[in-house]
């Protein structure tokens, strides 16, 4: 499977690697896979949010498969905050989700996800430790899973 080169930039002394929208538009594949629909782009990117990149791809006639976690959907935000005690800031408008032509639920047992986090398969070790101590607890993941179902 072909991978497009990322857009690499410096921001506040940190090297950031972002989805390269212009490369995707130039390549113009029939279908593209773009991770993390709710992601906030680096300042160097044309759009503030990744879902806006995806809207541009769709408007250019490119089909897109993407990923999103249930806690990133705007209308669910208050429920997620009341369950987890954490306000999720990376969110998409409901209309973006509602306009999807197809949605497929991909599920994993909460404990299995925690094990993947701890093994470094999702985030860096430091990020994973913070995540499992705060947001990604068995209780929170179980509640989010119930919301998704």
Task: Show where each model-derived region lies.
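C-terminal accessory "lid"/substrate-recognition subdomains
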Residues: 91-98, 102-149
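An amphipathic, basic-hydrophobic helix/alpha-beta surface used to engage anionic
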Residues: 44-45, 61-64, 70, 104, ...
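Conserved P-loop/Walker A NTP-binding site and adjacent catalytic elements of P-loop NTPases
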Residues: 1-63
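Glycine-rich, flexible loop/turn motifs
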Residues: 12, 79, 88
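Short, hinge-like loop/turn segments at secondary-structure boundaries
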Residues: 1-4, 82-86
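Conserved protein kinase catalytic core
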Residues: 41-42, 75, 113
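Structural recognition of the conserved hydrophobic beta-strand(s) that form the central parallel beta-sheet
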Residues: 32-34, 63-70, 99, 106
């Amino acid at each position: 499977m072909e991978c497009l080169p990322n857009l690499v930039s410096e921001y506040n002394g940190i090297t950031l690697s972002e989805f390269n929208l212009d490369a995707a538009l130039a390549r113009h594949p029939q279908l593209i896979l773009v991770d993390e629909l709710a992601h906030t782009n680096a300042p160097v990117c044309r759009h503030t949010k990744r879902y806006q990149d995806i809207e541009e791809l769709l408007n250019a006639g490119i089909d897109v498969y993407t990923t999103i976690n249930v806690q990133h959907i705007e209308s669910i935000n208050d429920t997620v905050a009341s369950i987890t005690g954490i306000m999720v800031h990376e969110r998409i408008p409901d209309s973006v989700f509602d306009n999807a032509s197809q949605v497929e639920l991909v599920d994993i047992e909460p404990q299995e996800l925690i094990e993947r986090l701890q093994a470094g398969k999702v985030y860096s070790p430091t990020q994973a430790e913070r995540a499992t101590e705060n947001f990604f607890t068995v209780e929170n993941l179980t509640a989010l899973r119930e919301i998704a179902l």
